[in-house]
Amino acid sequence: MFGDLMVFKAYDIRGIYGRELDENFAYSLGKCIGKKFENKKILVGNDVRIGSKELLPYFIVGLKEYADVFYAGTISTPLMYFGTKGKYDLGVILTASHNPPEYTGFKMCDKEAIPLSPIEEIKPIFKKYELTESIKEEAKNLNLDDLKVNIIEEYKKFFLKRCKASDKKIAVDFANGATTIAEKEILNELFDNAVFINDYPDGNFPAHQPDTLKMECLKDIIRAVKKNNCELGLIFDGDGDRLGIVDENGNVLRGDILTAIIAKEILKEKSNAKIVYDLRCSKIVPEIIEKYGGIAIKSRVGHYFIKKLMHEIDAEFAGELSNHFYFKEIGYFESPLLALNYILKAMDEENKSLSELNKEFSKYPHSGEINFRVKDQKYIMEKIKEHFKDCKLEELDGISIYCKNFWFNLRPSNTEPLLRLNLEADDEKTMKEKVEEIKNLIAKLDASL
């Protein structure tokens, strides 16, 4: 099938360049989106990936047949949201986020920076168009400078005014991704005492995959923090919408712990604020929110669902286990820079190191996300429900089961035959025992199929 329709996901379009996403797909996609947004203003940017840069001119040529196109250059996803909001009818960035270098893709948002769901809004209108020699020639000769708009200066101006300069010694791993452009300049001005690594753009990602969650991708930042005696380290993913943090000892802080730290600081400013957290997060998150006068709202996993919910309920902040942090202040989208600003504020106001804050908020042992490759997701989830029938059940996203001294969420992957488990308990022993129990149960059920 042309342009395998499996590339259309809930949150984006993503696939391997040259195999699942090629120039013909990019041109056809551009033309379909252009028709949908005929005579509208569309902002387009790209990350540093080789596939993104190769597909860009074909995508723009398709768009230009129907819509007015403006090119922002090589930018991060938060910068695309920032540039689109209130100024353009649609924003599109060619990116595959934290995936390996052979991938590319497309993320889209409307004029309020709310994500479009490709599987719901683009896949139904997608069709193949012929990539003629004249179209190829037009793409080859496309002068991007003729379409160029500068959205970086306004972005830099906003964050340099909003974020407090710090004398803390930090290390930053840019992972050779999109944040090596604007975000690097901002951090360079905010910190006099910063160590930058992997800080030049390279779509081959020579240092490591640009993923803030995989331990093998965090070795460089951990090493840099220890070697340079830094007070904290941060790492961006490939398109700059995730922020990973390590403390002065090189220990990684989970996304839900960071969510709790940031939420506490926000609630010092706005005590009755609504704060959203994804259902995988530790129960320390709602406990902290409620302790400091906030309203804790649980959400499905994923930026598409979280941003829509934030808009609907007018939430001040949202955080995910996956290191996405969203702020009403800038339009309900991700901002690693604002997240960092609040983390530094917590360290200053509490007069604590990051390791001390991590210890304070890491009250409950958490398994982290564990993946299981299974033959039948639905069958296994039903059997797990039966096994824990005496516990409280929620089905907001997969199944969440709440028992006396532990709870867990088991949900299917949208894109792979996987089940994802997150489990938390009141003590380490129970956590390990229950993870093992569920692992064995899933293995037994899968073997029976």
UniProtKB/Swiss-Prot annotation:
UniProt EC number? 5.4.2.8
Q: What class of enzyme is it?
A: isomerase
Q: Which family does it belong to?
A: Belongs to the phosphohexose mutase family.
Q: Which residues form the active site?
A: S97
Query: Where, by residue number, does Mg(2+) bind?
Result: S97, D237, D239, D241
The organism's lineage is:
Archaea, Methanobacteriati, Methanobacteriota, Methanomada group, Methanococci
Q: Which SUPFAM superfamilies match?
A: Phosphoglucomutase, C-terminal domain (SSF55957), Phosphoglucomutase, first 3 domains (SSF53738)
PANTHER family referenced in this protein's UniProt entry, alphabetically: PHOSPHOMANNOMUTASE (PTHR43771:SF1)
The disulfides recorded in the entry are none
Protein name according to UniProt: Phosphomannomutase
GO MF terms here are:
magnesium ion binding; phosphomannomutase activity
What the entry lists under Pfam families is as follows:
PGM_PMM_I, PGM_PMM_II, PGM_PMM_III, PGM_PMM_IV
Chemical reaction(s) catalysed:
alpha-D-mannose 1-phosphate = D-mannose 6-phosphate
Keyword terms, alphabetized: Isomerase, Magnesium, Metal-binding, Phosphoprotein
Q: Briefly, what is this protein's role? A: Catalyzes the formation of mannose-1-P from mannose-6-P. Can also use glucose-6-P.
Give an example GO biological process. carbohydrate metabolic process
Task: Specify the pathway.
Answer: Amino-acid biosynthesis
Q: How is the cofactor bound?
A: Binds 1 Mg(2+) ion per subunit.
Needs which cofactor? Mg(2+)
